[in-house]
Design a protein with these regions (language model features):
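N-terminal beta-alpha "docking/capping" segments at the starts of catalytic domains
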Residues: 1-41, 46
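Non-catalytic, low-complexity flexible loops and terminal extensions
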Residues: 1-13, 19, 134-142, 146-160
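Short, exposed beta-strand "edge-strand" segments with a Pro/Gly-rich flavor and a Y/T-containing core
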Residues: 38, 82-85, 160
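Acyl-thioester-dependent condensation/acyltransferase catalytic cores
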Residues: 45-138, 142-145, 149-152
Length: 160
């Protein structure tokens, strides 16, 4: 991500409720969108990079201090990976979602979100798995909306 937002440092202590969610085994908020178009990994990565500019918690990782405090920080954050899985049947996304839901988040390295594209040339499913520490259902709906805007119009300006 090469933007002016990289320059700004963001840090705040994780709240008690957020800390509770960090230890909850099933704290993933999920959205699945069926896209009736050809979406490439490059197109999706570009859209993810753009939505990171608008959604601050997509630019943070969680660091654990010596005294056991958890903090959100924008320093040393790795890129959000986009996973692509070939789509063979229209129900493949169900199994991919189930497997993706079991995978642990790498809180110390990158934002607690995953994007999985179950890809075909005519129709694909985009699975977004986000830890409840950085999103809820409504914020994930807004994020998905913004992602679709940038998938549909890669040249669209980012509204901050």
């Amino acid at each position: 991500m090469n933007t002016q937002y990289e320059m700004l440092t963001y840090e705040r202590k994780v709240t008690g409720a957020e800390r509770f969610f960090s230890h909850a085994p099933f704290s993933t908020v999920t959205m699945v969108a069926r896209i009736k178009s050809d979406v490439t990994a490059e197109m999706l990565q570009n859209a993810v990079d753009k939505v990171q500019q608008r959604h601050a918690l997509l630019r943070v990782r969680i660091k654990d201090t010596q005294d056991g405090e958890l903090w959100f920080t924008s320093q040393g954050v790795q890129e959000i990976p986009v996973e692509v899985v070939p789509r063979k049947t229209e129900n493949d996304w169900i199994e991919v979602h189930a497997e993706g839901s079991k995978a642990a988040y790498d809180f110390e390295a990158r934002p607690a979100i995953r994007f999985i594209l179950v890809q075909d040339t005519d129709e694909s499913e985009l699975i977004i798995l986000c830890h409840h520490m950085i999103c809820d259902g409504m914020s994930l709906a807004y994020l998905a909306r913004d992602l679709m805007v940038h998938l549909g119009d890669p040249q669209a300006d980012v509204q901050v």
